[in-house]
């Protein structure tokens, strides 16, 4: 008998057989800053109809044996593909914007594109906003610290950490290697129910 991943998880949950994961809370958003915060342009239900209409960005914490590391991700909201990522030992703008730069290098058209994130100081900074201006990307941000207004980005973070990054890396260098491998597997091999069991790469390449 073959069953899908989502059905299996719902079955386990129904019978209370799921193991509750213990998570260490680590705040990655500093929304108390002097920078301008852009309005939320997608809260009225904007839904992309193809890739490169909406990117969602977020930062997640990845502990190593030698200290902290932080993973910055940018995901295409239509295809669920991780189009940009970076790993560093800090959350400064210089480190975080590398994920945005990587995504922009792979961008295939110059049609209207929205970049949605929380109100973290990195995303609001002039250095990061300059990339928006230079590449004509529309900026959208959550209304305050509300993870539900950036739910897809949070979900992809969770998938990457709970399904692929299961081993604690030694240091940032090893974390970079592990994240690169995990992103490749996620993009090329992980089917999504929302994508009719296609992989992010399959959906992204179809356009």
Residue ranges and their predicted role:
Residues 133-137, 159-207:
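C-terminal domain-tail junction helix/linker
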């Amino acid at each position: 008998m073959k069953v899908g991943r989502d059905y299996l998880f719902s079955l386990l949950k129904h019978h209370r057989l799921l193991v509750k994961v213990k998570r260490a809370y680590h705040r990655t958003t500093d929304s108390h800053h002097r920078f301008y915060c852009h309005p939320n342009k997608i809260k009225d239900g904007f839904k992309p109809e193809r890739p490169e209409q909406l990117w969602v960005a977020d930062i997640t914490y990845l502990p190593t044996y030698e200290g902290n590391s932080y993973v910055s991700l940018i995901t295409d909201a239509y295809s669920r593909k991780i189009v940009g990522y970076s790993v560093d030992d800090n959350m400064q703008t210089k480190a975080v914007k590398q994920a945005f730069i990587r995504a922009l290098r792979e961008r295939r058209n110059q049609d209207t594109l929205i970049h949605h994130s929380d109100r973290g100081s990195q995303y609001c900074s002039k250095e990061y906003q300059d990339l928006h201006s230079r590449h004509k990307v529309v900026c959208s941000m959550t209304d305050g610290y509300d993870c539900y207004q950036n739910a897809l980005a949070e979900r992809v973070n969770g998938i990457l950490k709970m399904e692929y990054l299961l081993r604690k890396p030694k240091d940032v260098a090893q974390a970079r290697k592990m994240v690169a491998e995990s992103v490749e597997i996620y993009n090329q091999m992980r089917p999504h129910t929302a994508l009719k069991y296609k992989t992010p790469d399959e959906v992204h390449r179809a356009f």
